[in-house]
Amino acid sequence: MKFWEKIAGETIGAEIAEAAIVLPLMFTLLLGIYWFGRAYNIYATITHAAREGARAATASTCATCGNTALIESQVATRVAQALQASKLDPAQVTPLLPNPVLKDCQTGAAVIPACASSPAICFASNVRLNDPSTGPAACGVSVSFQYPYQFYLPFTSLNGQLIQLKADVQTTGED
C-alpha cells in the first residue's frame, strides 16, 4: 500500500506540467488551421479575380454595338475590381509569366504576354490553349499574376514565411 501512496504522492502537479506541454501545441495547431484556411481563401480569391479578367477579355466584340476587345490595362482594372471587392490590395499583385510558354493560335510562335502596371498582371490574347495533336486548336486568353501571403505560426519554421500564391487562368473565347 505504501508503494501506491508513494507513486500517487509524486504525481501532484502532473496535470499542470501536462497542460504546459499540450496547450502550446494545441494553440499552434488551431492557429495553423486558421492561417492555412486564410491562405486557401486568398488563393481562391485571386483565382476568381483572374477568371473575372479572363472572362471580360473573352467577351464577344461587336462592330455595330461599339464594344471592342479589351487591352491589358482594362483587364487589369477588372482584376483590381474583383480583388478590392474581396478586401485584397491590388497594389501587392506582381506579374507572373505563364509556364509553359504560350503559343500564338495561328502561327504557333511563342507569345510573351503583355504585363500591365497597376495591378501588375500578365495578359495574352489569341493564344493556343491545348496541344494541336490532340484535336483542333482551342484559342483564348491567358491572365496570370501572383499575390504575397505571410504565415504567422509561432514555434514553427513557417513563422513570418512569405510565399507567393499564383493565379494562372486560361479561358477560351466566346462566340
Locate the predicted segments by residue:
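Short amphipathic secondary-structure patches
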Residues: 55-144
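Residue-level detection of beta-strand scaffold positions
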Residues: 48, 79, 139, 170-172
